[in-house]
Amino acid sequence: MTDIREYLARKPLLFDGGMGTYYKAAPGADCEMANLTDPEGVKKVHAEYLAAGAQAIKTNTFGLPRMAAAQMPGWEELAEAGWKLACDAAAEKDAAVFADLGPAPDTEAAPASSAYGLVAQQFAALGAKNFLFETLSSDVGIVEAVKALRVAVPDAFVMVSFAVLPDGYTREGLLFRDLLRRMEQSGVVDAVGLNCVSAPGAMKKLVQSLGETLLPLSVMPNAGYPVVTRARVLYQGKPAYFAREMGQIAAAGVRILGGCCGTTPAHIAALRAELDALPQQTEAAPAAKLSTGAAPAVEKDDTFLRKLNAGEKVIAIELDSPRVADLSGYLDGARRLQAAGADLLTIADCPIAQARMDSSLVACRVHRELGMCALPHMTCRDRNLNATKALLLGLYAEGVREVLAITGDPIPTAERDEVKNVYQFNSRKLAQYIVSLAGEGREMPSAMTVFGALNLNARNFDVELRRAVEKLENGMSGFLTQPVLSAQAVENLRKARQTLGERAKILAGMMPVVSQRNAIFMENEINGIHVEEDIIQRFAGLDREQGEALGLEVSMQMAREALPYADGFYLMTPFNRVALMERLIARLKTELLDAEG
């Protein structure tokens, strides 16, 4: 085939379909391994797609970046075999061959850019000129790998395609518009696109909502949505429907088309006929723009944020939601804390992985019935992306516009057979996702404010600070810290202020210790809390009244030391002792905050 860029200037380019699902429709080995164990079978699949009218095919190497990241032996041989099989099949039809690279995991030990780079360079050494990075949930490592690739192959044609759910977000919570825009702005990519996860009808809506793109756009949806029949995953989307929807996508100006999971040669043949029936055009037409349909903003109480942004010291207080279905006592406690002077009520999301009333639902009740600013904690532990989004939309509609994004305590090992962790993303990605929901044409007219956790007691606080910087870069506005109960925690707070600067609002955590037993438990059994031995020993032999009195003194001492580096305080209520926290709030206001003001 002539140069891909020249071809696209004249007419749309039709790719093949889902190699993996089509090959596995017949008994056989794993798809990539078949390059060595069943080369004729792989070549036959290529030939069927070409006979159906495809002008470009992908090498049978989707899983190689994952294999390279895991340092699996033999992936280089799979790349070479896959490349030769595709080239041999394409030669008979003068079709283009794209080196196909699926997603790579990203870890500190094995960055995604390294895996992408290894596989891309392997294909470059084999003579590849066209590259497809596909089914990606994020763009991590892509630009770095492509820049390195262009050193070896300056005239390479590089496509980058993202796997997007019907709502426009990847499984990592990234909005497709943002991903495509970043790829366009990188200056190293030739075409951008969407593939997999969604069916053609949903993908058509995404394309119509996108507007004009600077680079050629690729669309390769699944044949439909999967069903499980007799323990097999099948796609039942009909070729005629697939072709009709894709024909409308092509008419909107999309220049690169094809199929992903479940698309067979029959789907590609039907699409070939649909494309041949379209009027010829020499330039890509912009995709249509639809009205945003954005809902009007709902009124909310922003007293807390207004004070915080004005430089006033604020008081946030945490009150754990009940373990039972009765919220009346909880609301009474919240009302007392509000009257005492708390600016914000925070509600933990099932702390130490033990079920309590949902923090977001409690926040809505507090906001609605008390008119108090509420900050629900939201963990990554218990919800996937869909459940998280549904909850966020509900919070926004209820006027709760602040959230604390945390990874969350893991489920205890003994319970994991019955209760499963989710952890689809970490707190940084969750924050990025929450921020991405807001804006013109998106789900929320205005952005929610996202806070994060900062562990002042981390053993390696330099690593914790680096993560804090990443959290800010991903959209967080500030931090609530773990309890300050040591001189080292105060020093780490000072370092945090110095490193993060004034752009980060920091609320210093204060949790009154109420007994020696309580102090020992906190030191030994609660992750992220460190109580100095001197403090533990001071509680020896004290009764409840004496313990609370000393706990207040220790908290006030720590608050005085933390105040120069904090924008306020984050108070944690031990054992739901509201009366104790009323006393602490009163002392903080009269002895520190009012005096400072």
Where are these regions (language model features)?
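Domain-level signal for soluble alpha/beta catalytic cores
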Residues: 1-597
